[in-house]
């Protein structure tokens, strides 16, 4: 796996992790989903520290998805840390939380999150969210079809 093949999910609810893994498979996301239980483990993963030191086994992600309310370090802590690390300037971060609080949405945005989505109550709605993730952040842009232009060149 390369860094372009990996998505990092920081989520402490095992049921939500299982649902997310199932939705990834159902949608056919061509990426490895690596799940960590909290913001602290996500930071260790991104640093390549401790059990995550082998980059062949734990490659850098192309996308970070985080819950907000986690036991050790929160999603806010994680976003704040990522924001201070210049090597992660281009890493898109998505918040997927059960919080409906406008202040949480605003703070996540201030800390660099590209999107804030409320965790859906139904699996099919999660599948739709994963489809959006795939389209917007996990599918490389297709090269333009220039065949009609090339046919007109002298």
PLM regions: where:
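Active-site residues of response regulator receiver
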Residues: 67-68, 97
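Alpha4 helix (beta4-alpha4-beta5 surface) of REC/receiver domains from two-component response regulators
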Residues: 18, 22, 77, 100-115, ...
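Residue-level signal for the "D+5" position in two-component response regulator receiver
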Residues: 35, 72-73, 110
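Acidic catalytic/metal-coordinating carboxylates
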Residues: 38, 59, 74-77
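Short amphipathic alpha-helix used as the core "switch/output" element in two-component signaling
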Residues: 51, 76-89
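Conserved acidic segment of CheY-like receiver
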Residues: 5-15, 20-25, 33, 64-65
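Active-site beta3 strand of CheY-like receiver
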Residues: 53-65
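The feature encodes the CheY-like receiver
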Residues: 71-72, 101
């Amino acid at each position: 796996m390369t860094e372009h093949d990996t998505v990092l999910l920081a989520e402490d609810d095992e049921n939500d992790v299982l649902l997310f893994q199932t939705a990834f498979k159902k949608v056919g996301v061509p990426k490895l989903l690596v799940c960590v239980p909290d913001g602290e483990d996500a930071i260790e993963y991104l640093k390549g520290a401790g059990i995550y030191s082998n980059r062949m086994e734990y490659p850098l992600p192309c996308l970070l998805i985080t819950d907000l309310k986690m036991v050790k370090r929160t999603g806010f802590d994680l976003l704040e840390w990522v924001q201070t690390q210049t090597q992660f300037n281009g890493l898109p971060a998505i918040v997927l939380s059960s919080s409906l609080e406008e202040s949480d949405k605003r703070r996540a945005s201030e800390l660099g999150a590209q999107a804030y989505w409320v965790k859906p109550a139904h699996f099919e709605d999660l599948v739709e969210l994963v489809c959006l993730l795939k389209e917007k952040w996990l599918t490389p842009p297709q090269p333009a079809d220039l065949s009609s232009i090339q046919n007109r060149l002298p």
